[in-house]
Each structure stands twice: as C-alpha cells, then as structure tokens.
Amino acid sequence: MQSFHVLQLIAVGFGGALGAMARFIVSNQVYAWWGRDFAWGTLVVNSLGSFAIGLIMILMIDKFHASVEMRSFLIVGFLGAFTTFSTFSFETYSFLQTGEITKAMLNIGVSVLTGLFAVWLGIWTGKQFFSP
C-alpha cells in the first residue's frame, strides 16, 4: 500500500470543499437559466470538469511541474468534488423510471461524448498555449 503525506490529505479536503461549493453554485445557476427538464446542471459541471482536468494536467506536468499537494488539491479534491458521476447516474436512472427513455439515452450519449471532447479540448488548449 502506497503511503501519502498528511499535507496531501489536507489539500484533498480543502479542494473537495471548494469543488463541492463550486458545483452547487454552477449547477444551480445552470438550472435557473435552462430549467430542470433535463440534467443540464450535471452535464455542464461534468463537461467543465473534463475540460479542466485536461488543461490542468498539461499545465501541471509540462509547464509548472506542480507539487503532489497541488495536484491532489486540484485533481482529486476540487475536480473530484466538482464533477459528479453519481448524480449523472441517478438522473439517468430517474429518466428510466419515469419512462423517459429518450432523455436517459440522450443523457448518457451527450454526457460521455461531451466529457471526452472536453478532455481532448483541454489537453489541446494546454499544449497549444502553454507547452514549449
């Protein structure tokens, strides 16, 4: 079993708290703008988080050589709490339970494809603007 430093644990905790608050704010604002007919809030935070992880990984590895504590804060803590697979799964299940099969399938397809595209876009952006 690999050990970790207490500072990593603290970094994950603080990052997680901030990420959870950011997710709450962003997803609620998205629902206020676009309504709750579809899982818009979850789709937006997961897409933003996917873009951010691609960009941040390039920046931390190629540009800034970030410490393990900073990586733990941003990737595991902040983005781990900001994005949410469990909410995506529950919303999809709820669509299925209410017979909204099209919405369920759309949620799965759009979420996965948007997430993959956002990661690619984040990596591409990082390499275009920040790599040597």
From Swiss-Prot:
GO molecular function, one term: metal ion binding
Catalytic activity as recorded in UniProt: fluoride(in) = fluoride(out)
Subcellular location: Cell inner membrane
Binding site for Na(+): 80, 83
Keyword vocabulary terms for this entry: Cell inner membrane, Cell membrane, Ion channel, Ion transport, Membrane, Metal-binding, Sodium, Transmembrane, Transmembrane helix, Transport
Activity regulation (UniProt): Na(+) is not transported, but it plays an essential structural role and its presence is essential for fluoride channel function.
Keyword Cytoplasm: no
Gene Ontology CC: plasma membrane
Broad class of where this protein is predominantly found: membrane
Pfam family, one: CRCB
Transmembrane segments: 6-26, 41-61, 73-93, 104-124
Top-rank taxon, per record: Bacteria
InterPro entries named among the record's database cross-references: FluC
Membrane topology recorded in Swiss-Prot or TrEMBL: Multi-pass membrane protein
GO biological process, one term: cellular detoxification of fluoride
Keyword Cytoplasm listed: no
Function: Fluoride-specific ion channel. Important for reducing fluoride concentration in the cell, thus reducing its toxicity.
Annotated family: Belongs to the fluoride channel Fluc/FEX (TC 1.A.43) family.
Name this polypeptide is given: Fluoride-specific ion channel FluC
Organism this protein belongs to: Hydrogenovibrio crunogenus (strain DSM 25203 / XCL-2)
